[in-house]
Amino acid sequence: MIKIITGRQTDPLQEKILATAIENYQQHPENETFIIVPNHIKFTTEVRAINKLASSKKQTETAVKNLHVLSFSRLAWFFLKDAEQGLPTQLDDAASAMLLTHIIEQKQDELIIFEQSNSGMVRQLYNTILQVYDGNLDLDNIDETNLDQETKSKIHDLRIIYDAFIEEIAGKFSTKNEVQVQLNDILAKNSELKNASFYFCDFSHFSLQEMLTIQILMRKAKNVTLAFKTRLGNINPKAEAGDYDYVIQQTIRRLVSFLQERDMDYVASEFPIPSEPTPREILNSLWTETVSKVDELKQVQLVKADSRYAEAYFVARTIYQQVALNNYRYRDFLILAPDLKEYETYLTPILRQNNIPFFNDLQQEMKYHPLVVLIENLFNLRDLKENPFQTQSMLAILKTHLLIPSWYKEEAEYIHDVDELENFVLAHGINHNLWKKHFADFVSAEVIRLDKIDEEVAKIDRLRGYLVDKVTNLFTKLEQEKDSQKALTIFFDFLTKNGIAERLEQWRDAANNAGDLQQAQQPEQLWDLLIQLLKDYLAINPEKFDLDEFFNMLISAFKEATFSQIPSTLDAVNLSEMGMVQTSGYKQVFIIGATSGNLPSIEKKPGFLTTENLNQLQSSFESDAYLEDNQRLNNLDQNYQFGLSLALAQDRVYISYPVLNASNEKLDPSIYYQRLQDYGAPEFSQHDLPEKMQELLSFITNPDASLGYLAYINSNTSDEAIDELLKITQKYLPQKVKAVLDASDFDNQPEDIGEDLAAELYGKNLYSSVSQLETFYENSYEYFLTYGLKLRRRLENEFDVIQAGNYFHETFDRLVKRLNEQHIDLADLSSVELEQQLNQVRDVIKDESKYAQLMNDPFNQYLFHCLDHTTSKVAQNWRKSLAETPLRAKYSELSFGLDQKIKGISLDIPDLPGNHQVNLRGKIDRVDLANFAEKDQVLAQVIDYKSSAKKFDLGMFYNGIALQMISYLDVLTNNNRFFAEEDKLSLLGAFYQTVTRQLERLNSNKLIDSSLNLRENAIDSKPKLMYTGLISNNPEILLEAEPLLDGKSSQASQLYTGVGTKARGGFKLPADRNFSEEEFQLLLEYDEYLIKEASRQILSGQIKLNPYRYGRSKNALTYSDFKDIFFFDAMLRHNQYHEISNMSKKDLLVKIKEKLGKKD
């Protein structure tokens, strides 16, 4: 008897099938009764069937013999277990990936499109090979006449790889779907099926081999019953692509056609339509458009959440409250998501916080396990000659905690040493062969605290030596070994003799003791797979061992492998993904992540053969030999699958989406969400935090999870109900409640430390630098952390912007000092002679340890080469410009301050009890002098090197953030005798020298004037190299600095940006950047005022979180290392930026006079 039962998506077809099958079993217990369901729901269906059988006997439990609940794969093993000829070892996904990688590398020269293998490509190829095998397709019979070049090339490569694959596994392995082929062979020969009954349900589609199984059973078995859920609960032979139930109707059509072509009798019946539809059935009718509208849609609740966190919390809160208040069980709830990985960091922690048991049936990949990480990074270290000991891989191995030396008795001690070793390695730039050197060889540089602690360095050096020896010994042996058996023994011994296997056992036991059965299984599953892979490799490649091939196969295999999972309790919320078959019987279903990008879940990435490729191959397919377009089937089935998800909920279904993703990007709801909204489904807004008292119920669960929300609303609202809830919570969590309530009153503004503690940190007198005080004015809290507590980010010896800047400075410093020592005027050198001088300077610099370590990296060598080009360009421009001016570089990197030849800025600090001073130290990049003996005068200018263009900002100076240039001028003024002896020291100004070789764009107006003529002086980007900054507006001083301007009208300066002569006489000067001698004196006085004021606040212990902000894009937090300490949020009332804006010279001088108490 063959029956095809159809029903709607809400009809209890599984219940019908189970009842029919159990009735048949009870009537004929001596005969076999089989219930066949998708593998995903086999366990729950089996439990349900046995419970149903027990209930029919009015028992709580029962034993069965001939009643079987199986999936197709289990059905195959059922019949194969007694077969005379058993199957060879099954080749799982991981081993298949290994074999295919091997074949692709072997057949490289014959293949057209496969240049190299990768895990994604291997996965696609393997699925296609399984399809070809499953689909009885002979690739040699494909007609290539009308195929395009892409399809021809793919078939060409597929044929080569497929034949090689089949040849390799013949007699040794079976594919995971070969068992289905063997099943059909056995069933076709089985004469005992005439008394067996088969019942199929919860399928919407069958593979070709599964379809063949059903067809054999239809011809040989006593009973075959199949149940299908369609749109109207009937068979529609005219269904077309795009119809709601097209995929399942196609499945039914193939079965019916098979029966009709062979004149086989069958009965088609429809599940009866109830007279009074339930809300669930009404929803299904609405979704399948069998009714156009309803008065009220009670079955659905739409949820618009502020974020994924809010969405996940809504789910947990709803489940918690339903279980607590409405007698639900946890197993009554199902959570579905189009992509469950998006909610990994939200959903499971929130469920755990609310003590909600759950089972996540999303398969967990093995590739993230520490053992796989260890193997991958060992492989990265295989090249001991050309690319040895890559720091990233060495550290990654240590951090797996699998390769721990035996002298460590406590893991905490090992972790401490790994952290210290990482700090040391990064600080000293240790990479490649430098790992072979003892760490003691690096400590002379004294770049970190650890360099001065010999005992600690010795400990981490021992760990370094251990790892280097283990890696070296392993790969030295493997490189020399050509026999696969011996090579695998070497690798296996490495894992076992170094305690890695023992470590995995410890992890397993610890997880078992903690009751985490899922985690406890992982080490064992991983180790079992590794053993199997080693066996498989030996079977695939028994003779000639290839190191790279072995590791590539191993890594590819692990990337394809997943951990098997079991639920730790039967009463648990189930987490799954849309599209996976689910058992019926859930009371409430949550569909989360219903965004426009996720639902419908359109598959955009094709398989190895695309839809276009398969369309071209259609003419070569037959009814019993074809390839299906799984991507197309998936996309056509989306509406139907969503309807199935809606129908799973007996009581209610919740569909939710987040308004924002983790990157704060706006998300739109799915078209399915919008469609339900159009049908009249109510929408609820779930916020991240309760905005008012009435919303609090949306956040209340257990005391632990609810406390934060109670504290939040308590800080914003005064209500007796909140006080009562907090009192109740305090009974369960007294310490945590106190801590959270105290935290809700937390103000992240730092407290002043007072004069006594400030004196301990800084001393009685403040010894500081200009740049440090600039940090104070940028954000005084950062000054405290940096120079008070001396916090530092971890030092990494890498060639960054700071290192590049240091190299620029050092190059120019040594050049100036070298020329002065040799009494050479830079202006007298030729271009070639200057380059020779620079090369000699560079050779000396690069031999120093701090740069020599960087030169081990070829890329760093290239960067140094680029920097040398830049310094040459700047130096050559400087040499040429000296023809315009008598100013010559007299001092470079000139230090000032206590114990220096040059006095620093020493000032008494006012308004502070006791006698306190501030002493500023620092270095001036360059001081240029010109001696005018006939005038008893020395002209001076300060030069400061910058790696990018910079202008002196008056607003920044006024607020203490740009003190450097004025302070340097103050140092010159205070050291008149040093620079000019008895003569007068005249200040030309302080200027920035941009160190760059950047050229102007060809279409820049700086290169081409309004008449479309080329600006000659801009061809080599000379304007970018001219001095910018503060300049004297004294005509006499200007002419002394650049004599060639004398007597010329409308002549632009060749040295200073914005300076030139006017047509009618006089000078054109940069607006707001030119000052008279009296104005310079005012700037110097204000500079000292700012220095004293900052020093007073520092020594009095005042600290503020007051970062500056200049406009919208520039602020003190942009490059700060302490943002995680500040927790600065401009939206909080306690946190405010110190706003700064540019100002004119006029406004600056007025404000300075006000501050200093001077009258105009």
Curated annotation (Swiss-Prot):
Keywords: ATP-binding, DNA damage, DNA repair, DNA-binding, Exonuclease, Helicase, Hydrolase, Nuclease, Nucleotide-binding. Gene3D superfamilies: P-loop containing nucleotide triphosphate hydrolases. One of its GO terms (biological process) is double-strand break repair via homologous recombination. Its EC number is 3.1.-.-. InterPro entries: ADDB_N (IPR049035), DNA_helicase_suRexB (IPR014141), P-loop_NTPase (IPR027417), PDDEXK_AddAB-type (IPR038726). The keyword Chloroplast does not apply. Its cofactor is Mg(2+). One of its GO terms (molecular function) is ATP binding. It is an enzyme of class 3 (hydrolase). SUPFAM superfamilies: P-loop containing nucleoside triphosphate hydrolases. Despite having helicase-like domains, this subunit does not have helicase activity. Belongs to the helicase family. AddB/RexB type 2 subfamily. Heterodimer of AddA and RexB. The heterodimer acts as both an ATP-dependent DNA helicase and an ATP-dependent, dual-direction single-stranded exonuclease. Recognizes the chi site generating a DNA molecule suitable for the initiation of homologous recombination. This subunit has 5' -> 3' nuclease activity but not helicase activity. This is ATP-dependent helicase/deoxyribonuclease subunit B. It comes from Lactobacillus helveticus (strain DPC 4571).
